[in-house]
Amino acid sequence: MSWELKMAKAIKILNSNAVWKSEGTSWDDVVIEWLEETTPISKEDIKAEMDKL
């Protein structure tokens, strides 16, 4: 599974209503922009959830 797909799944697990867009070529340089008043989720929390997938 690609890191992008893992990231998307992790974000949806942490906040099923999250709206975001991201840019980057790897997890290390990804920039996540939270849209539509979504409460931001820390990259550390997202990474921890990604590691479970």
Language model region names:
Residues 1-53:
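Interaction-interface detector
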